[in-house]
Amino acid sequence: MSTTPQEREKPVRVLVDNDPVPTSTEKWGKPGWFERNLARGPKTTTWIWDLHALAHDFETHTSDKEEISRKIFSAHFGHLAVVCVWLSGMFWHGAYFSNFTAWMENPLGLKPSAQTVWPVFGQEILNDPSTVAKGFEQGGIVITSGLFHLWRAVGFTTTGQLAAMSIAMLIIAALFLFAGWFHYHKRAPKLEWFQNVESMLNHHLAGLFGLGSLFWTGHLIHVALPVKAQLDAGIAPAQVNPFAGLDYGLMGQYFPKGFGPNGGLGAFFTLNWGQFTDFLTFKGGLEPATGALYLTDIAHHHLAIATLFIIAGHMYRTNWGIGHSIKEMLEAHKGPLTGEGHRGLYEVLTTSWHAQLAINLAMAGSITIIVAHHMYAMNPYPYMGTDYATQISLFTHHMWIGGFLIVGAGAHAAIFMVRDYDPVTNQNNLLDRVLRHRDAIISHLNWVTLFLGFHSFGLYVHNDTMQALGRPRDMFADFAIPLQPVFAQWIQNIHAAAPGGATAPWVGGTSPTWYTGALSSAATLQANQVLALANDKISISPIHLGTADFMVHHIFALCIHVTVLILLKGVLFARSSRLIPDKANLGFRFPCDGPGRGGTCQSSAWDHVFLGLFWMYNTISVVIFHFSWKMQSDVWGTVDRSTGAVNHIIGNTDVLLGGQTVALSQYAASSININGWLRDFLWAQSSAVINSYGGPLSAYGLMFLGAHFIWAFSLMFLFSGRGYWQELIESIVWAHNKLKVAPAIQPRALSITQGRAVGVAHYLLGGIATTWAFFLARFLALP
């Protein structure tokens, strides 16, 4: 028997602490326990505002990086639990209050619904008349989340399955809650564990993305695809066998190559992968029957993603001494004009979670906006392309989420600069060089923004003026002086020409949106050019881009550049400026730089985020209005298969020019001036919500009014000075004192920062809910 000499044993690293924080509901039950001043209890009404501001700002609770990291990690599990409870509610409503069963049998003829209004005081008028007319015992209010389409795509066919999933989600939520408690109170990771980025990358890439995609591929092949095959074969949803994917013989009926005598695992291990091409395809484009991406293409896509990410998850150096070191790569990343390059950024990203979060938010926000565009151009779920209310809802939702995430990136980048930036470790690296060039960067960005603003808006003003003067020939328009978006058309042509070429000889086109060909206008579309489903509704069609698109895209550019200008200025000037050299000492948010320092108000990093939110709102509003009008005018509608005609939701506009009539889509003809946007889009399309009272859409009319009120209420906070409110409060307190009914907690007016926070929150809530009501009343009124 031999023993290993002691000196040769590798010491085991303990990466967790046992029982670091006792579980104490008594302590947590005391409001403000996490901060010394708050724990004393309220003296003034400011206390409740500070409670909200600081509850999740862990860095104000402690300066211990390890403790902060553990709190964030634990909170992630709590967040996942909340998401699972929320999803459980979705499944529960789908199981017990929806018309999912009926919708599955007639997805093109019914609108999804998962809630019905009881007949109290006539409120049942809110139930969708088509649902009531068809004699459904369940379902009433139309839902536009796309969940029914998603559920059908992934293999749900009965409400019993939805109920089981609802219970499963609650169980998963409970497990996440337990994990959050366990990893903070019983086995809490050490700071070293959080800073081990190579191991984290390997596990996230190979585990979460790689194996996650592989598991999903398995689900698609063994559950979703056989369910779809049975539905396509005419089997009633209630009779579909959800376990067919586990029966080799049954699968062989639907996929004879992959599950035939020469298929299965044998084909996999002998590298005869061509056998799998009946369920792992590369068809490209959309399935004509459903208007959705081919499910076999989606399975193939996820298998490819899984392969790539599992490989990527083995790239970084951990215990084995092979692979990349992030620190070495960053420090080697320098060029002839970049000084020290990325040296020091490893320390930044492993000691500042704000810096890491800022990068992740910027990427996640951008990806979410890309998702918004993919959802309509390459609709992933069956029959969703013709559910226009759902399509506009999903586009708007993803655009808003993306906008908020990107503003959040600016916020956390600024917090990093104030709280975590170390000038000593960032000497002549790219971060330091950007900060030293900040005046040039911001002034150039400012100039570009002004140029964009005057020129893009100037095109619209020019057109309004020419129209008012009766000179249509002098307008910038497809019918007069065209401004063709040549770069966008070039990108369209690249995508249209790619399939069948040398680069992709086997691939079909990704979407009909690219195939504009000789299309001179959306008004000339024919039925054979669009993808229309069995109910003759258009799912997607070629999208013609012209002068109107060129103009509005320059408005997008203006709005995006202003948003970036505000956020980037907030980040680059977060620590100091000529006006306030000691800004870093004042913190992330401060109202002004004290008395006698006029002109220093609204210059904190927080105030830049505050202003950035308004411009983000402007940006997203223009984008979703453009999308709504363009799709109704140029894409969505119906086809007449007997004549080959395409009838868009909004009919074409005849433009009279020099005695000749030119037919254009309404969007191409009207959106080229401000008057057109106000009259033909906002005013014309708001008729549905304004006239909704007394019908099933009346809830949206009330929401439209209420949201306008919330928006107007915000102006009271945004336009007023704090002094006015404090004086008003003092006089009310005086009256209470006279009557000896003064409260124990002294009333205080909101601080300047609190007032702005309340203002922007109500401004955005009011604006978003107004847009929501405007869109849904319009789209649900359509047949």
From Swiss-Prot:
PsaA and PsaB bind P700, the primary electron donor of photosystem I (PSI), as well as the electron acceptors A0, A1 and FX. PSI is a plastocyanin/cytochrome c6-ferredoxin oxidoreductase, converting photonic excitation into a charge separation, which transfers an electron from the donor P700 chlorophyll pair to the spectroscopically characterized acceptors A0, A1, FX, FA and FB in turn. Oxidized P700 is reduced on the lumenal side of the thylakoid membrane by plastocyanin or cytochrome c6. The chain crosses the membrane at residues 72-95, 162-185, 201-225, 298-316, 353-376, 392-418, 440-462, 550-568, 608-629, 697-719, 757-777. This is Photosystem I P700 chlorophyll a apoprotein A1. GO terms for molecular function: 4 iron, 4 sulfur cluster binding; chlorophyll binding; electron transfer activity; magnesium ion binding; oxidoreductase activity. Belongs to the PsaA/PsaB family. It catalyses: reduced [plastocyanin] + hnu + oxidized [2Fe-2S]-[ferredoxin] = oxidized [plastocyanin] + reduced [2Fe-2S]-[ferredoxin]. Chlorophyll a binds at residues 716, 724.
